[in-house]
Structure formats: structure tokens, C-alpha cells
Swiss-Prot record:
<feature type="topological domain" description="Cytoplasmic">
    <location>
        <begin position="1"/>
        <end position="111"/>
    </location>
</feature>
<dbReference type="InterPro" id="IPR001757">
    <property type="entry name" value="P_typ_ATPase"/>
</dbReference>
<dbReference type="GO" id="GO:0008553">
    <property type="term" value="F:P-type proton-exporting transporter activity"/>
</dbReference>
<feature type="topological domain" description="Extracellular">
    <location>
        <begin position="844"/>
        <end position="847"/>
    </location>
</feature>
<dbReference type="GO" id="GO:0005886">
    <property type="term" value="C:plasma membrane"/>
</dbReference>
<feature type="topological domain" description="Cytoplasmic">
    <location>
        <begin position="351"/>
        <end position="711"/>
    </location>
</feature>
<keyword id="KW-0479">Metal-binding</keyword>
<keyword id="KW-0460">Magnesium</keyword>
<feature type="binding site">
    <location>
        <position position="634"/>
    </location>
    <ligand>
        <name>Mg(2+)</name>
    </ligand>
</feature>
<comment type="similarity">
    <text>Belongs to the cation transport ATPase (P-type) (TC 3.A.3) family. Type IIIA subfamily.</text>
</comment>
<feature type="transmembrane region" description="Helical; Name=2">
    <location>
        <begin position="137"/>
        <end position="155"/>
    </location>
</feature>
<feature type="transmembrane region" description="Helical; Name=1">
    <location>
        <begin position="112"/>
        <end position="134"/>
    </location>
</feature>
<feature type="transmembrane region" description="Helical; Name=3">
    <location>
        <begin position="280"/>
        <end position="305"/>
    </location>
</feature>
<feature type="transmembrane region" description="Helical; Name=5">
    <location>
        <begin position="712"/>
        <end position="734"/>
    </location>
</feature>
<feature type="compositionally biased region" description="Basic and acidic residues">
    <location>
        <begin position="14"/>
        <end position="31"/>
    </location>
</feature>
<keyword id="KW-1003">Cell membrane</keyword>
<feature type="transmembrane region" description="Helical; Name=6">
    <location>
        <begin position="755"/>
        <end position="776"/>
    </location>
</feature>
Length: 916
């Protein structure tokens, strides 16, 4: 046991001898999270920072400036140990401006005018022109007012909601760490100027073009946003790094050579606009609905024209019929109401600390069926505490702790949770703490997700060069084994301890070191725990009731992951990600790999590629998948997922790739946002069903009335019906919508089926009203007591159409969900106005009795009940859904063969890459 003896000797050389028993006694209690501890740790880090031996950067060399507006070479010769002074920063900012692209400020006039553009708006504008041609100035004015009203409401609501989101987005602004006045300072990215000495490290989004000036620097930089190249590019001293690139590995200093529009990206406007806030699938849905409704309008007009020509109607009469059908057949408020609903929803989510990067994320989050969640910080507290260490025979725990802390970051900003836990635990290791600051760090290599280790080369007070390593226990053990054989009893005891810690839910970190040119020494294992958040188990149960399946993806060992999953109630089907066999190995057929992923509760020891593959497999099985992440290596899977979620504290790269950025910690924030997104989606869905049914209602009724009886409803009343339909439902964006207990999607066949049937029932109710007024005494028939046909029909149409929204907005019977006061008030106001129209005979002359009005209200309520019963039956009918849409077919043999083929190709491709 030569290595043990050496370790013991080393301990004696650096520490006064302390018995392991005493050391263990002091470390058993968990560490409290108190402010004074954080202050003590910050003071220690500041002391360590002042001795940063690993930031030994050299003066930069002359090189080509990186911008369309060249920066003189003399401005790029900044002292790399002192940086710029405040006066130099001010002068350069005055000359070169802020480090930001010149944004084309959105022209508010053009933005407002955009609400008059679109297929539906064009039809209404054509209707206005037609009304002007008929010299029907009342209809012309009302149609124009309707277009203007929808534009104003949509513009104001979206502007207000956008302002709320923009305010919170400012908190996500990129930061930069620069060397100024001899000190590292964090500034906003736009404040960087040419000649600044910029510090970059893993996870940094580079804010401006620059050239690396650190000797022996090694960075891996993701330039996919610029070049489209998926693999990271290696960078060394003298190489240029471009703005918007992400550092995936390493750390270095660089001198800024170009900022703002003078950067490589700034000279390519198309790249600047690459990250547009798309509106997603719902825009396609609206366009499709608008197109179908236009086709139905045209078909109805053909019927009307044929019947009119057959009766030799005048051209003016035909144009009046055309105008009536056009106005009622196209829902002019549809785009504005849906966009407003989404924008208001985004603002509401922002208040709940969920920043929506693009509106389409709301829709996709509402439909998510599987959430692939990382463990640390989302399911757990991300507050590690250390337990009693396992030391190899002859090793002092103080020695183990000192080595582990030497292999830790010495920067206050960006220090990870593991290093923070070790530094906090130094209060239990006074001797290690007392000598830690006497060591000078020569090299520091941050955590490498491939080797799963972090290492540092330090210089001891005695001048000895020591290499310290901590990381995944088996990876550290492998490092020692590659240097020299480890005695079987030590190897066995070490591995057994790793397994024991894992079964107890501890995450283990192996610690080893090498003195000078000597052999590697294995020192022991430090167990740490990251307990589940207090609300995680409850939230997971709630997620299950919402039809959401959660799969845990973690880099921890299988035992730890399985124990954590068991504690949280996720299940124990947690496997090593290598079993996927997508890394060039494995014999499982492709279809079985897909089944395996589908059935698993989670995967452990995952690499970024595993996360990407899991998301891809689930998507190919037809699931909508959300993925959480926080690191730069999570960016590919965040982009691949239907909804990429950057959790609290995520790196700039992860935030840039995500669809939604959370400022609040934990799974509960995500589930709250999911419920809210389902509410928003439900509002949109309810309004779309409602609005299609209204259009079909009057197309069917007026088409039949004109074709059979050669007459139509008064044009002014038709226009007011269209106005009332839109005004009443503008408040849908603020409705107390219920959220679905299952993931929601645009089931368009079922949506159209329900809308058509509701439209037919509405048309039948209106036809009954019409026909009962055509019989009986000269004062009217069964429904009408006395008065005119047009006002009575107007009231019946207005009431039944307005009340329909109370039916479509509910997830069950219409009485199961109470609407908001805004929606109820808007509907009531419109009903009162429609009633006054009828009583006083506005626009058509002739009054209608109160008795007739009461009869219409009673009859309309009867229609409302029939509609409510029909919608409730259709909504929950699997048979109707199968008839209209059909369920997804079961995976057939052809599908499984394709999956086998795809996985085989992936394995062959990976094996080829390894062999080459």
C-alpha cells in the first residue's frame, strides 16, 4: 500500500497530526444555510481570488481588428493585468457607441396598420367598399368602425402585455466580466468597449468580437449561431471569437476588437433577426380557419347568386345580399382576439416569473405530455451539504478536504454548488482552512462533462507542484488506475463505499492527487447530498393528475438517481443512459430502445447527447416534449424539445436556446406555468369554436332565407350582429378559464365538427323563430306578439350567439365554471343594447312589445340549454372524436422496422467516428 503511505506522509508534511476520530466528530451535523456562513465564505474566496495564479495572461499581439469600422491597433494594446481605466472606457464608448446592434425600432404606425392586413381583414375591407358603392353610409361607417375597433384593442393589449414582458426580460440581459482599473468587474454586455479585457468561461455567451490573449488557452466555442456548424471549435491564443458564440469548455481572457454593428454578426442583418419571436402553430391554425370560412362564404354566395338570377333580382338587391353574407361569414375579430389572448397570457406568466421568449411557447407548453427534467435545482434544492468522508487507510480527512478545495474555483461569481459546499464545510476542517490560502493555483481546469472531473495544478508553500483532482468516483479511480495498479482490497473497499453511498442517496466525489512527477494517490470519497425540495413530491403528484409524465435525466450515478426518484414518487425504473446503446454499442433493437425510453422513469449518468436522443425518441413516438436545462451543454436538447425551459440560474447559452426562462426555482413554478398555459389555450380554443359556429349560423340561415324566401335581414342589423359578436368576446382574454386535466392540442377535425353542429342548431333555432312569425294573425305568430320580423330576429340571434361563449368556455356543463366579471359584464351589456334595439325599433322603425321580448328571451334560453347539452355530449364523446378525427394508430410493424433501422444507422455512424 505504497500510495497510502505516501498519502500519510504528505499529510504529516502539511498539517499537524490530527486523529481521524476527532475530525469525524466535528463533521457530522449538516451545515445550516446562514448568512454569516455565506459572508465568511465570500471573504475566503476574495482572499483566494487575490492570489489567482491561473489567470496569468499575456499581452496581446497585434492582429486584424474585427469590424467594418476598424479599431486602431494602439487601442488594442491594453495592459492585460490592469485593463482599461474608467476614463478610457468613457472615451471609447463615446467614439464607438454601446455594444449593441442598431435595432430597427418598430414603427408603431406600421404596427397599427398591420392589424388591417390579412385575408379576413381584406374581406371586410371589400365589404366596406361594397357598402360605399351601394351608398349605404351607415353600414360603411359601422364596418370601418368595426375594423378600427379590432385594430385598436389588439394594438393596445399587445403593446401593454409586451411592455410587461420586456421589463422582466431586462433582468435576463447578458452580463460580461471585464478587467478594469486592475479589478474584475461585471457589467452589462452593452457596456463593453473595444480594448476591454474580457473574461470568458464555460457557459459564457461572448458579447463582442475579440482575440484570445491568455497563454496556452484552450477554449471550445459553439459557433453554430453564426456558421451552422454543430461541433464546437477549438480556440487558442491569437484566435478570434465572435459575438453570440457560446463557450462550451475552458476559460481565458480576450481583448475586445469590435463591438455592436462592427462585429461579424453585426454586419449580417439576417443573423441578427434569426431569433425571431415566432407565433407558432396557432397562426397556421387561424390562417387555415380563415381560408375555410372564405371558401364557405363563396359557396354560400354562389347559392345566393344562382337563386337571385333565377328570380331576376336587381343588381342592387344581389349586391345587398352579397354584402350581408360577406359581413357575417368572416369573423373580423378572430386574429385580434386570439393574439390579445396570447399576449395577455404572456404578461400574466411574466408576473409569475416565467418569461415567454415567443408566444408560440404558450401553445406548445399547454400540449406537453412528457417533461424531461434535470434533477439538481429543479427536483432538488441545489444546496449541497457534505457528510462524513470515507478516507483510504492512512489518509487524514483534513488532507482529503484540502485537496478537494484546491481543485475548486477561486471566483466568487459563477462558483458552482459543489465548490460552494466544500468551501462552506471548511469551518469543520480548521487546519485545511488555515493553509488553503498559502497555495498558489498555476492551472485550473473546470468541470469537464466528458471526463467528469475538475482538476487544478497548485504550488505548495514548500514549492512543490501538486495536481489535485475531484469528480465522479469511478472516473477519479480510473485516473489512478491508468497510472499504476491499485491493491484489490483498496479498490474493492472504494467501490463498495461508492455503492453504499449511492443506496443512501448520496452523491459521491472521489479525490486524488499527484505530487510532482510522482504517482497518483487515491485519497478517498466525500459524500454530499442535495435533498429534494419540500414541494417536489406534492408537485409531481399534481403533475400526474394533469396527465404529465416526468422523466428525470441526471448525470448522477444510477443508485443516487434511483433513490432520489423513489423519494419523489417518480418510480424506480431509472437506468444508466449507456443502456440506450446510442453511443455505438448495445444490441437492443431500435423499436425496443424506443419502448425502453417510453417506459423508463429516468436515466442516470447522462451526457448532453443522451438528453438530445431521449427527446428525439419521444418526439418520434408522437409525444410533445418539454426539456429543462441550465448549462451550455443543455442548449441542443433545449432547442430540440417542443418547449425548451431554462431553469432559475441557467447559463446565458441555455437561456438563449430556451422558449421559456424561469426566474423562480423548482418544479412547482413549471407546473404552475403549465396550468396557466392550458388556461390560455382553452380561452383561444373556446373562442375559435364559438366564432366559427357564429359564422356558420348566419351563413346557413341567411343563405336559406334568401334562397327560399328571396329576402334577408336588414343590412344595418347584420352589421351590428357582427359588432356585438366581437365586442362581447374581447373580454375572453381575462376570463376565469378552467385548465384541462390532460394535455391540450388543436384537434381541428373535432373543432370543426362541434362548430358545424352548433352552427346548425343555432340556424334551426333562428329558422323556428322566423317561421313562427310567418303564420297566425297579422300581428305575428307564436313567438311574436306584435312588431316587425327584423328586430325580433335580431334579438334572437344576438342572445343565442352571445350566450354560446358561456358554453364553449366550460370544460363540462356550462354552470361548472363561473365566468369572469369582465366577460359576464360585456355579454350583459350587449344583451341590453340588443334588447333596446328591438323594443324601440332602432334603424328599422316600429316598436316591439315587452311581451314579445320576454318570449324571445325565454325561447333563446331554451336554445341555449339545447346547445349546452349538445356541446357537453360532443366534448366528452370518444365516438364523436373517432368519427371526426380518429385516434393515433397503434405502432405497426412498419413503424417498428423503421425505428430499428434508424437506431442501427446511429450505432454504425458512431462506431465509424470512433474508428476514424
Amino acid at each position: 500500500m505504497a500510495h497510502s503511505a505516501a498519502s500519510g506522509a504528505a499529510s504529516a508534511a502539511h498539517f499537524e497530526k490530527k486523529t481521524p476520530e476527532v475530525a469525524h466528530e466535528e463533521k457530522k451535523p449538516p451545515l445550516p444555510e446562514e448568512e454569516d456562513e455565506d459572508e465568511d465564505m465570500d471573504a475566503l474566496i476574495e482572499e483566494l481570488e487575490s492570489q489567482d495564479g491561473h489567470i496569468d495572461i499575456e499581452d496581446d499581439e497585434d492582429g486584424e481588428p474585427g469590424g467594418a469600422r476598424p479599431v486602431p491597433d494602439e487601442l488594442l494594446t491594453t495592459d492585460t493585468r490592469h485593463g482599461l481605466t474608467d476614463a478610457e472606457v468613457v472615451a471609447r464608448r463615446k467614439k464607438y457607441g454601446l455594444n449593441q446592434m442598431k435595432e430597427e425600432k418598430e414603427n408603431l404606425v406600421l404596427k397599427f396598420l398591420s392589424y388591417f392586413v390579412g385575408p379576413i381583414q381584406f374581406v371586410m375591407e371589400a365589404a366596406a367598399i361594397l357598402a360605399a358603392g351601394l351608398e349605404d353610409w351607415v353600414d360603411f361607417g359601422v364596418i370601418c368602425a368595426l375594423l378600427l375597433l379590432n385594430a385598436c384593442v389588439g394594438f393596445v393589449q399587445e403593446f401593454q402585455a409586451g411592455s410587461i414582458v420586456d421589463e422582466l426580460k431586462k433582468t435576463l440581459a447578458l452580463k460580461a466580466v471585464v478587467l478594469r482599473n486592475g479589478r474584475l468587474t461585471e457589467v452589462e454586455a452593452p457596456e463593453v468597449v473595444p480594448g476591454d479585457i474580457l473574461q470568458v468561461e464555460e457557459g459564457t455567451i461572448i458579447p463582442a468580437d475579440g482575440r484570445i490573449v491568455t497563454e496556452e488557452a484552450f477554449l471550445q466555442v459553439d459557433q453554430s449561431a453564426i456558421t451552422g456548424e454543430s461541433l464546437a471549435v477549438d480556440k487558442h491564443k491569437g484566435d478570434t471569437c465572435y459575438a453570440s458564440s457560446a463557450v462550451k469548455r475552458g476559460e481565458a481572457f480576450m481583448v475586445i476588437t469590435a463591438t455592436g454593428d462592427n462585429t461579424f454578426v453585426g454586419r449580417g442583418p439576417a443573423l441578427v433577426n434569426a431569433a425571431s419571436a415566432g407565433t407558432g402553430h396557432f397562426t397556421e391554425v387561424l390562417n387555415g380557419i380563415g381560408t375555410v370560412l372564405l371558401i364557405l362564404v363563396i359557396l354560400t354566395l354562389l347559392v345566393v347568386w344562382v337563386s337571385s338570377f333565377y328570380r331576376s333580382n336587381s343588381i342592387v338587391t344581389i349586391l345587398e345580399f352579397t354584402l350581408a353574407i360577406t359581413i357575417i361569414g368572416v369573423p373580423v375579430g378572430l386574429p385580434a382576439v386570439v393574439t390579445t389572448t396570447m399576449a395577455v397570457g404572456a404578461a400574466y406568466l411574466a408576473k409569475k416569473k416565467a418569461i415567454v421568449q415567443k408566444l408560440s411557447a404558450i401553445e406548445s407548453l399547454a400540449g406537453v405530455e412528457i417533461l424531461c427534467s434535470d434533477k439538481t435545482g429543479t427536483l432538488t434544492k441545489n444546496k449541497l451539504s457534505l457528510a462524513e468522508p470515507y478516507c483510504v487507510s492512512g489518509v487524514d480527512p483534513e488532507d482529503l478536504m484540502l485537496t478537494a478545495c484546491l481543485a475548486a474555483s477561486r471566483k466568487k461569481k459563477g462558483i458552482d454548488a459543489i465548490d460552494k459546499a466544500f468551501l462552506k464545510s471548511l469551518r469543520y476542517y480548521p487546519r485545511a482552512k488555515s493553509v488553503l490560502t498559502q497555495y498558489k493555483v498555476l492551472e485550473f481546469h473546470p468541470f469537464d462533462p466528458v471526463s467528469k472531473k475538475v482538476s487544478a495544478v497548485v504550488l505548495s508553500p514548500q514549492g512543490e507542484r501538486i495536481t489535485c483532482v475531484k469528480g465522479a468516483p469511478l472516473s477519479v479511480l480510473k485516473t489512478v488506475e491508468e497510472d499504476h495498479p491499485i491493491p484489490d482490497e483498496v479498490d474493492s473497499a472504494y467501490k463498495n463505499k461508492v455503492a453504499e453511498f449511492a443506496t443512501r442517496g448520496f452523491r459521491s466525489l472521489g479525490v486524488a492527487r499527484k505530487r510532482g512527477e510522482g504517482s497518483w494517490e487515491i485519497l478517498g470519497i466525500m459524500p454530499c447530498s442535495d435533498p429534494p425540495r419540500h414541494d417536489t413530491a406534492k408537485t409531481i403528484n399534481e403533475a400526474k393528475t394533469l396527465g404529465l409524465s416526468i422523466k428525470m435525466l441526471t448525470g448522477d450515478a444510477v443508485g443516487i438517481a434511483r433513490e432520489t426518484s423513489r423519494q419523489l414518487g417518480l418510480g424506480t425504473n431509472v437506468y444508466n443512459a449507456e443502456r440506450l446503446g446510442l453511443g455505438g454499442g448495445g444490441t437492443m433493437p431500435g423499436s425496443e430502445v424506443y419502448d425502453f425510453v417510453e417506459a423508463a422513469d429516468g436515466f442516470a449518468e447522462v451526457f448532453p447527447q443522451h438528453k438530445y436522443n431521449v427527446v428525439e425518441i419521444l418526439q418520434q413516438r408522437g409525444y410533445l416534449v418539454a426539456m429543462t436545462g441550465d448549462g451550455v451543454n443543455d442548449a441542443p436538447s433545449l432547442k430540440k424539445a417542443d418547449t425548451g425551459i431554462a431553469v432559475e440560474g441557467a447559463s446565458d447559452a441555455a437561456r438563449s436556446a430556451a422558449d421559456i426562462v424561469f426566474l423562480a426555482p423548482g418544479l412547482s413554478a413549471i407546473i404552475d406555468a403549465l396550468k396557466t398555459s392550458r388556461q390560455i389555450f382553452h380561452r383561444m380554443y373556446a373562442y375559435v369554436v364559438y366564432r366559427i359556429a357564429l359564422s356558420l349560423h348566419l351563413e346557413i340561415f341567411l343563405g336559406l332565407w334568401i334562397a327560399i324566401l328571396n329576402t334577408s335581414l336588414n343590412l344595418q342589423l347584420v352589421v351590428f350582429i357582427a359588432i356585438f359578436a366581437d365586442i362581447a368576446t374581447l373580454a375572453i382574454a381575462y376570463d376565469n378559464a378552467p385548465f384541462s386535466k390532460t394535455p391540450v392540442k388543436w384537434n381541428l377535425p373535432k373543432l370543426w365538427g362541434m362548430s358545424v353542429l352548433l352552427g346548425i342548431v343555432l340556424a334551426v333555432g333562428t329558422w323556428i323563430t322566423l317561421t313562427t312569425m310567418l303564420v297566425g294573425s297579422e300581428n305575428g305568430g307564436i313567438v311574436q306578439n306584435f312588431g316587425r320580423t327584423h328586430p325580433v330576429l335580431f334579438l334572437e340571434i344576438s342572445l343565442t350567439e352571445n350566450w354560446l361563449i358561456f358554453i364553449t368556455r366550460a370544460n363540462g356543463p356550462f354552470w361548472s365554471s363561473i365566468p369572469s366579471w369582465q366577460l359576464s359584464g360585456a355579454i350583459l351589456l350587449v344583451d341590453i343594447i340588443a334588447t333596446l334595439f328591438t323594443i324601440f325599433g332602432w334603424f328599422v322603425g316600429g316598436q316591439t312589445s315587452i311581451v314579445a321580448v320576454v318570449r324571445i328571451w325565454v325561447f333563446s334560453f331554451g336554445c341555449f340549454c339545447v346547445l349546452g347539452g349538445l356541446y357537453y355530449l360532443l366534448q366528452g364523446s370518444a365516438g364523436f372524436d373517432n368519427m371526426m378525427h380518429g385516434k393515433s394508430p397503434k405502432k405497426n410493424q412498419k413503424q417498428r422496422s423503421l425505428e430499428d433501422f434508424v437506431v442501427s444507422l446511429q450505432r454504425v455512424s458512431t462506431q465509424h467516428e470512433k474508428s476514424s
